[in-house]
């Protein structure tokens, strides 16, 4: 439906914001572009909209090349972070403005606005000016202005970043429900990984103008392609421990475990990734055992974050575990278990090494030698 081919965007100062991005988006799909500031996500969105002239590449919408067309001719509607409403116009006139410019009849405009206002629950605001609306109400109006145009593609440029946390959570649900009802292909830009996880059919993680990974929220979370993706998606972020692997044995904190791997791998500078919520306080089968020296406990109500140090391959390293709420003593060593199937291995280039679940075995002979 939307096909981006080898998109490059270089600014006049020589900065290349987008570096040959390829992306195919299906009809009705909700795609979220996510990444830190400067990753190129907004440049891609503005290039699709026609607000930025691309340096090279092609953009096709429904089989039609649009990168050489004016923004008004692309059949795309955009929802901005700052709402972009006309302050001197009523909500009704803001909704009607684009349709009037296209020569749509008054009767058709009234019909479209009535339908959209009912869908977005803004009927009672139609006579008000934007200044009389709350942030959430303004965002609904901005979305309504995009919807009445009946475009082939919706673009969302960090639309919730000006709202408080509670309203953001509510509006996330509103946007997701609305997109499902309308079935319009949508591209959404955010730096917030929670928005990405909750809204997207597929997430596109960007780093320095290039795509680091494309996948469903579950794929990106459970099979991150790199340490960058693993650290960016998930809160608290994934823990990383320096480890090594030799002859099929993972070496960490003076212990060895047999772990499955796809190739004959020997690596002296492996990175082991562990999600904080995968640290169990009870022995489990097919797991490695570590010892967490407790330094800080953050109670969150239903659970708590336990911050501490774990003895890694090259010294103590920071680690966070999510546990049930319970009394813990600062300075104590807390034994934790992590299932092998929940471990993430990354190579020297910080790229994922695929592994599958298999029972680990502690090399007791080496432990005995170290104890002697």
Curated annotation (Swiss-Prot):
GO biological process, one term: glycerophosphodiester transmembrane transport
One Gene Ontology term, aspect cellular component: ATP-binding cassette (ABC) transporter complex, substrate-binding subunit-containing
Cell location: Cell inner membrane
Record key words, sorted: ATP-binding, Cell inner membrane, Cell membrane, Membrane, Nucleotide-binding, Sugar transport, Translocase, Transport
Chain sites annotated for binding ATP: 35-42
Protein's name in the database: sn-glycerol-3-phosphate import ATP-binding protein UgpC
Function of the protein: Part of the ABC transporter complex UgpBAEC involved in sn-glycerol-3-phosphate (G3P) import. Responsible for energy coupling to the transport system.
Pfam family name, one: OB_MalK
GO molecular function: ABC-type glycerol-3-phosphate transporter activity; ATP binding; ATP hydrolysis activity
InterPro entries: AAA+_ATPase (IPR003593), ABC_transporter-like_ATP-bd (IPR003439), ABC_transporter-like_CS (IPR017871), ABC_transpr_MalK-like (IPR015855), ABC_transpr_MalK/UgpC-like (IPR047641), Mo/tungstate-bd_C_term_dom (IPR008995), NA-bd_OB-fold (IPR012340), OB_MalK-like (IPR040582)
Subunit details: The complex is composed of two ATP-binding proteins (UgpC), two transmembrane proteins (UgpA and UgpE) and a solute-binding protein (UgpB).
Organism this protein belongs to: Vibrio vulnificus (strain YJ016)
